[in-house]
Amino acid sequence: MQVPRVKLLMGSGAMFVFAIIYGWVIFPKILKFMISKQVTLKPGSDVRELWSNTPFPLHFYIYVFNVTNPDEVSEGAKPRLQEVGPFVFDEWKDKYDLEDDVVEDTVSFTMRNTFIFNPKESLPLTGEEEIILPHPIMLPGGISVQREKAAMMELVSKGLSIVFPNAKAFLKAKFMDLFFRGINVDCSSEEFSAKALCTVFYTGEVKQAKQVNQTHFLFSFMGQANHSDSGRFTVCRGVKNNKKLGKVVKFADEPEQDIWPDGECNNFVGTDSTVFAPGLKKEDGLWAFTPDLCRSLGAYYQHKSSYHGMPSMRYTLDLGDIRADEKLHCFCEDPEDLDTCPPKGTMNLAACVGGPLMASMPHFYLGDPKLVADVDGLNPNEKDHAVYIDFELMSGTPFQAAKRLQFNLDMEPVEGIEPMKNLPKLILPMFWVEEGVQLNKTYTNLVKYTLFLGLKINSVLRWSLITFSLVGLMFSAYLFYHKSDSLDINSILKDNNKVDDVASTKEPMPPANPMQSSTVHPVQLPNTLIPGTNPATNPATHLKMEHRERY
């Protein structure tokens, strides 16, 4: 078969160009287009079903800081903390009352989180352990009144002594009572000061309190948030513009917040954290709005990672240094006065939750060193306390993530309330939580066999084509070099076969300078056996000796 050198050159060159264009340009665009059509929140799509009703629970961990020297701290001593945890819960997420707006390409929904205690994963903890924490009503209430309504201090102090008789600055209670079942708030007194204090419970200003009858309430950190409305979102469906998939456009039916003194901090940036757009660039970061903080937070790319053998990108985030970052000054009480900004690595939640609470990373990780030095018992480190996400950019899939956040009391002495008048001024850690997810193989295989299998096939195909084209180009160069018009493949194969035949039948060549040799006639030896041997024949009968010339 004759292959003209010009055709061989053109064919090999065309194959090379096709491999480059198809493998690195056309195929990626086709794949991205297919993903963009599949990954939307359009009713009836698989992504919509997974997004609205997460078919598996997230892991929710609670770590509590037990104060081991409460009486000394009440007199101004340095707090000694003992971390107790994790108390493990299964967190189920679902969205209900979904309303689609086809024109705006949005969907509105109400988010609901349900926490179910996991006794097996919590062992040896049971949830009935007694914990000592700052009094969750007296301390935040007293500090808030001193800062904002000092004229009412005497009335509030008297009311607290009636509603919480003999109360101290620190409360000892079971974990489940503090966080879910609730501690009792008795508003049955007819005293004016007690009634005035209880007004904030009856009007719903204390969001963590649940009314059980006409005169009693139960207060807990998370009980009211369990299996209840946690906010109504409106997000983009991504049908018309896939890059906007999941983007929050409204929360509580408002296009922006009215919490912070500057408008920029009130904007919604990113998604609701349960879905992300595919095809993001790693330098864009992963942004999500967090209602608990009344703020959007962004995670930034750190390095490449892998999950179950699939490549991913590791993202991390922190709360930053509000004082040092001009773009974050709107989170200060007064953006013009930097002294009102919280310390590095913390965020003041007073405007968001209505109390003297501060958010931070667990153990004040990446925070001001003074925060760690003010208390005993903290050990900040990246492994246990950093926030991270392992994310696959092309499909927009988070493979695993750990969202960690610590809640602290911005504590100070309160002269008007006897149990609080000698408290030290510092930021006291109370507890921290971790919301984690690790996709199992059922869901990672969806990505593996729809995305990575296609990428692998494309990689094999393009490199195979490139290899064949390079071989063709080398043969073409050979023909042009030898000025041959064509390549006779049959002749080459025939010549190769001839070479193989000659190589297999060729006799071995004699030595260059052969020496004469003679066989010495065997000498008859006595038939004697050596103990331990049993030769079949006498070796001397096969002995050959070289005949050497004497000089």
Swiss-Prot record:
Plays an olfactory role that is not restricted to pheromone sensitivity. Residues 1-7, 481-551 are cytoplasmic. This is Sensory neuron membrane protein 1. Belongs to the CD36 family. The chain crosses the membrane at residues 8-28, 460-480. Glycans are attached at residues 66, 213, 226, 440. GO terms for biological process: cell surface receptor signaling pathway; cellular response to pheromone; detection of chemical stimulus involved in sensory perception of smell; lipid homeostasis; pupariation. Disulfide bonds join 265-330, 294-352, 332-341. InterPro entries: CD36/SCARB1/SNMP1, CD36_fam. Keywords: Cell membrane, Disulfide bond, Glycoprotein, Membrane, Olfaction, Receptor, Sensory transduction, Transmembrane, Transmembrane helix. It comes from the Eukaryota. It is a multi-pass membrane protein. The keyword Transmembrane helix applies. One of its GO terms (cellular component) is plasma membrane. It is found in: Cell membrane. GO terms for molecular function: scavenger receptor activity. Residues 29-459 are extracellular.
